[in-house]
Amino acid sequence: MPFGDNYIMSPINRRRCSRVSPVECLQLTWSKCELLVLEFKPRMSFSHTQIVLYPKNTCCHSFKHYLSHQTLSSLKSVESCIRMGNLTCMPSSNSRERSRLRTIVSSIVYTQAVAPISTPTFKVPNQAQMSSPIWIRTETPSNGDNFRSMDDLLEAVNNQRMMLTPKRLTAAVSQKLLM
């Protein structure tokens, strides 16, 4: 399953949400409770979502031990927490605020659910590829002046490939001296 393991946690028990996507987990939790905490891995990782569930009237401070010190120190408000994408909590005090936050969290979880699992990879060319140009652009004036023939272009490419390094320069000088 592409989403990895999902967990529903409560202070009393912890059970695995088997074969359920984060979106389905979110729908499942709202029928049971009014306080929901979603804790994601780093922003670029779409392979794992943890859902931490608490019953009604549970104070936010009671789940401090589940959160890292870094998350707690950066947590200033519910909205900043949502923007970070690391932690999302929904207080049950105000129904209007709760429904607005529910919409935001639904979109976050949906994004996590449909996002591609691949991570971008960057291929760095080796030094030999970087030193030799693949394409040389030449301009041809309308009157034909300064036109470079194909032989000139090939010679320029070969000359660039044969750039003298200190070692090659020493060898070339010693060879010329021996002649």
Swiss-Prot record:
BP-aspect Gene Ontology terms: symbiont-mediated suppression of host innate immune response
Keyword annotations: Host-virus interaction, Inhibition of host innate immune response by virus, Suppressor of RNA silencing, Viral immunoevasion
Organism superkingdom: Viruses
Pfam families: Gemini_C4
Record keyword Iron present: no
Keyword Metal-binding attached: no
Matches recorded under InterPro entries: Gemini_C4
Function: Pathogenicity determinant. May act as a suppressor of RNA-mediated gene silencing, also known as post-transcriptional gene silencing (PTGS), a mechanism of plant viral defense that limits the accumulation of viral RNAs.
Family according to the record: Belongs to the geminiviridae protein AC4/C4 family.
Protein name, UniProt field: Protein AC4
